[in-house]
């Protein structure tokens, strides 16, 4: 599978949001993170910082 770990970066702190995310959508509310089973999590007021598909890692940052 091609899931990626999603992290929220705040300064020097890297916090795991979801271990195996299949989709990330950036909305007005924040980042919507969805796994392969459809479980959703909303990270309020977050934007995409970096998507490293080689490392299967997606980094979010506060707005």
Task: Describe these PLM feature segments.
Residues 2-63:
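Compact, glycine-rich, soluble single-domain proteins
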